[in-house]
Amino acid sequence: MAMIKMSPEEIRAKSQSYGQGSDQIRQILSDLTRAQGEIAANWEGQAFSRFEEQFQQLSPKVEKFAQLLEEIKQQLNSTADAVQEQDQQLSNNFGLQ
């Protein structure tokens, strides 16, 4: 049997860290994409082509990681809701409101 030792509020607070991490990663990727464009305007040749290829291969992986963090945030919030609902249901068994 699973045991969660955090309150729903604590779980929700921790979930925000994942959402913030996702936002930060997306901002970093945006900044790097902009920098990549500036480099592309000033660097030609085979070396840049390889550099660009690596960047293009990496970008979707970084975006996928940001999406995963957002999904974790949502899962934690859903877990917090379930814990809160379960606690409320159990308290009703004792006539508590």
Swiss-Prot record:
Intracellular or extracellular location(s): Secreted
Observed effect of gene inactivation: Significant increased of early and late apoptotic host cells including infected epithelial cells or dendritic cells.
The keyword Lipoprotein belongs to this UniProt entry's keyword annotation: no
Keyword Secreted tagged: yes
Coiled-coil residue spans: 61-93
Entry's Gene Ontology cellular component terms: extracellular region
Main location (coarse class): secreted
InterPro entries xrefs: ESAT-6-like_sf, T7SS_ESAT-6-like
Gene3D superfamilies referenced in this protein's UniProt entry, alphabetically: ESAT-6-like
Superkingdom, natural source: Bacteria
Pfam families from the UniProt entry: WXG100
Entry keywords, A to Z: Coiled coil, Secreted, Virulence
Known function: Virulence factor that is important for the establishment of infection in the host. EsxA is required for EsxB synthesis as well as secretion. Modulates host cell apoptotic pathways and mediates together with EsxB the release of S.aureus from the host cell. By acting on apoptosis, plays a role in the modulation of dendritic cell-mediated immunity.
NCBIfam families: WXG100_ESAT6
Subunit-level organization: Forms both homodimers and heterodimers with EsxC.
Similarity comment text for this entry: Belongs to the WXG100 family. sagEsxA-like subfamily.
Protein name: Type VII secretion system extracellular protein A
Record lineage: Bacteria, Bacillati, Bacillota, Bacilli, Bacillales
Gene: esxA
